[in-house]
From Swiss-Prot:
UniProt entry keywords in alphabetical sequence: Amidation, Neuropeptide, Secreted
BP terms from Gene Ontology: neuropeptide signaling pathway
Transmembrane annotation, as ranges: none
Compartment(s) where it occurs, according to its Swiss-Prot or TrEMBL record: Secreted
Protein name: Locustatachykinin-3
GO cellular component: extracellular region
Function: Myoactive peptide. Stimulates the contraction of the oviduct and foregut.
Arginine amide: residues bearing it: 10
Highest taxon, organism lineage: Eukaryota
Amino acid sequence: APQAGFYGVR
């Protein structure tokens, strides 16, 4: 699961 991706997109 892309944790950094979630926050990165947000």
